[in-house]
Amino acid sequence: MSKLKLISPAVPNVPWQDKPEGHTGAPVWRYSENPIIGRNPVEGVARIFNSAVMPYGDEFIGVFRGEQVNGIPYIYLGRSKDAIHWDFDKNKIQFVDEEGKPFMPIYAYDPRLVKVEDTYYIIWCQDFYGAAIGIAKTTDFKTFVRIENPFLPFNRNAVLFPRKVHGNFMMLSRPSDSGHTPFGDIFVSESPDMVYWGKHRHVMGKSSEWWESLKIGGGAAPIETSEGWLLFYHGVSGTCNGYVYSIGGAILDIDNPSIVKYRCENFLLTPEEWYEERGFVPNVCFPCATIHDSESGKIAIYYGAADSYVGLAFTTIDEVVDYIKEHSVVTTSDTEEGR
């Protein structure tokens, strides 16, 4: 039983593998059978990566970034009995507008999947006169209705909170430019209806730590805990041979997520294995989802690896929160409301 409380439903069949003997460093360890999704997983799809999964009934469901053989990314639906071995629909998700008419994005990538009350929301990056945030909703994973674009371009890495805060939906995002953005901070915005968004607040920016000195962006949906919102995010460093994407951790205030309570100065996971270092885009660990069990405190982290694979890692709520707090370094802009 965890000493900290995960405020979420129990998921007794959360995928899990015990920490390897002799493991050192941050308390996040890889699944020994990684990657869980390899190349050419579906006819016409070269790679699946940067994808989001969650419990659905007694099994699991997910939305997956499928890079087609023509290079265009779309979102595919997948199902699994154990959240490790996945079966994918052969065709990409067919979106409609609120009148039921076909309404497909030009492209769609890096989806997140979050349930708020009785509705599942898919959030992704799309083309809206440049890179922008797209949102769709479903209640049955059969009909996917696109709703209004929340923000102007350019924006990426949007992540919806799993419940309303003070009666409003809350969403993290990372304003950007139209290309491979060499900058970026995390902001939070709120909405009464998932249409009109405002009260934009700065959450946190890049830091002086080398692993996240270029830019940062939201990752998996924040996890509600008795200590605050646990956020796994990505941090990027620039090297003479390109960018390196690592996974970081922070804890946001439960009532005002623009305030950072703790922020780990060390990365939690950085590219080290072949499937993280070698691929279409080398040196990438990009978190997009977690599955967590409130009874045991177990957390499974799903991340894109080298823009080519899906990796799985594990931690526990007690270990990761203790580590973040023990190695926390926050700035004035982190701890103040960013307005």
Question: What residues fall within each predicted segment?
Answer:
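Catalytic core of Fe(II)/2-oxoglutarate
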Residues: 220
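Beta-rich carbohydrate-recognition and catalytic domains
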Residues: 1-106, 114-214, 223-283, 294-298, ...
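C-terminal substrate/ligand-recognition segments
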Residues: 288, 292
